[in-house]
Curated annotation (Swiss-Prot):
Lineage: Bacteria, Pseudomonadati, Pseudomonadota, Gammaproteobacteria, Alteromonadales
Family according to the record: Belongs to the RNase HII family.
Keywords assigned: Cytoplasm, Endonuclease, Hydrolase, Manganese, Metal-binding, Nuclease
Gene coding for it: rnhB
UniProt remark on cofactor binding: Manganese or magnesium. Binds 1 divalent metal ion per monomer in the absence of substrate. May bind a second metal ion after substrate binding.
Enzyme Commission code: 3.1.26.4
Designated name of the protein: Ribonuclease HII
Gene3D superfamilies membership: Ribonuclease H-like superfamily/Ribonuclease H
Subcellular location: Cytoplasm
Amino acid sequence: MAVFKAITTEQVEILTAGLYAGVDEVGRGPLVGNVVTAAVILDPTKPITGLNDSKKLSEKKREALFTEIHEKALAISIGYASPEEIDELNILHATMLAMQRAVAGLDMAPTSVLVDGNRTPDFSHGEDTDRNIESHAIIKGDGLVAGISAASIVAKVIRDREMDLLDMEHPQYGFAKHKGYPTKAHFEALALHGVLPEHRKSFRPVKERLAKN
């Protein structure tokens, strides 16, 4: 899987001149569930106030922006990689695959793809696309580029909702509170109740719990 060198922040203004797709992920660290990615093409004629890294926003603010993004964006697509794919590929490659899926699912072709972080997959030859798309990684892009901020928010809200649904099915694990991250409460639930099908079997705390069965 191709990886490209991250660009400097000085180049951001040039790259955001066209109808680019901002891409970000949520859920690399949790022990359970999908890694969720979003690709968003914003409408430059419909600016959205308050976009920022989703981790710096309250849940209420994220939900409000989530609605506004869906009302104003030109295109939005979600890409997933399942726990099984994470276990098979590793979390990095599964995340890259999910990003490819998100971009491939867009209703329109972006002029380029800007990804939060220090690496990006090759969006020209993903499993569902043969588009010739230039991509760039932008370190801390979710706080610098509006489209990446929007993708961060969309992915965060989607994944949090998934965890809320999983919490309804398995309330004893407390997923609505810790969202699947490796917290003390999650470790205690794993020890007491065991591993669920949705858990990532390759992650050490889960693997160690399975070894005790």
